[in-house]
Amino acid sequence: MTISVAVSGASGYAGGEVLRLLAGHPNVTIGAITAHSNAGSRLGELQPHLHGLASRILEDTTVENLSGHDVVFLALPHGASAEIAAQLPEGTVVIDAGADHRLQDAAAWERFYGSAHAGTWPYGLPELPGQREALKGATRIAVPGCYPTSALLALTPGFANNLLLTDDVVIVSASGTSGAGKAAKVNLIGAEVMGSMSPYGVGGGHRHTPEIEQGLSNAAGEPVTVSFTPTLVPMSRGILTTATAKVGHGVSYAELRQAWADAYDDEPFVHLLPEGQWPTTKSVQGSNHAVMQLAFDAHTGRVIVTCAIDNLTKGTAGGAVQSMNIALGLDETAGLNLQGVAP
């Protein structure tokens, strides 16, 4: 089975990562490669690491250029995907790597994004309860945010098994600078980032907060309240999330560990590490893998889960390709058999 794929937003980090993975996919032929302000440029000028595609010329991001493909990846800023997606044929598999179709609550979308809600699509995180089935045959898929990917993988087993309390969840995530996109910003230049760490979106202001609460609430079957703080760290890619929650009365460490093991032992890309080994972002760099470890703080009655992912791969493009594979009935791991990079 060979499928034709178009990729929009190909000059950015997310679009470039989608192309990197698709270039090694055994079932994919890459069709239109589009950008907006960079239309007419050689891809190799903007994505010099994509050697096999370097001579391709970027087309303008229009419905006409994206139509006629089996699959369309939209790696566009929030607010830009919905208008294009609405005009693409219903039978085309459209995978939105932006935020436009993730949230179920229209009021939450309007509060955090300041525009009209475009609707909700099946959520592209197959490891969540029920999501793999929801993605089979889907023609519209919303790729999760990078922070929610790590946070939901970290805590969902506890909430899905009624082991955690819902009103005291604290999540702190450290991210590399590529999570902020490719546009030039003063706070992201080398002189500002090197040798420094800084929080942002503090006090519940980050747009991924309602997405994290949504996913954990779905797992728990009741509302979950989350305090989320992201931190910018001096590396190009990767996320290390530390997520903590109060455990229910009488819940033991053995019960916690068993719940996480049961959730992920058979997953191809999510791994609970052996006791005593802790996640590092370097170990998953460039791969679709997530690694995690958990501990139980008996003094405070909290579980602490750390989870490392590559924000551009498992946190964006890898999750998108994995979801495409499931939707089309392909091998779920096709194009994603990449290990981490060391040193």
UniProtKB/Swiss-Prot annotation:
Domain of life: Bacteria
Organism: Paenarthrobacter aurescens (strain TC1)
Subcellular location: Cytoplasm
InterPro entries named in the record: AGPR_AS, AGPR_type-1, NAD(P)-bd_dom_sf, NAGSA_dehydrogenase, Semialdehyde_DH_NAD-bd
UniProt EC number: 1.2.1.38
Gene3D superfamilies linked to this entry: Dihydrodipicolinate Reductase, domain 2, NAD(P)-binding Rossmann-like Domain
A cellular component term, taken from the record's GO annotations: cytoplasm
SMART domains per record: Semialdhyde_dh
UniProt keyword list: Amino-acid biosynthesis, Arginine biosynthesis, Cytoplasm, NADP, Oxidoreductase
Pathway as given in its UniProt record: Amino-acid biosynthesis; L-arginine biosynthesis; N(2)-acetyl-L-ornithine from L-glutamate: step 3/4
List of catalytic residues: C146
Protein known as: N-acetyl-gamma-glutamyl-phosphate reductase
Catalysed reaction, written as an equation: N-acetyl-L-glutamate 5-semialdehyde + phosphate + NADP(+) = N-acetyl-L-glutamyl 5-phosphate + NADPH + H(+)
Enzyme class: oxidoreductase
One function term, GO molecular function aspect: NAD binding
Similarity section: Belongs to the NAGSA dehydrogenase family. Type 1 subfamily.
Reported function: Catalyzes the NADPH-dependent reduction of N-acetyl-5-glutamyl phosphate to yield N-acetyl-L-glutamate 5-semialdehyde.
Encoding gene per record: argC
GO annotation, biological process: L-arginine biosynthetic process
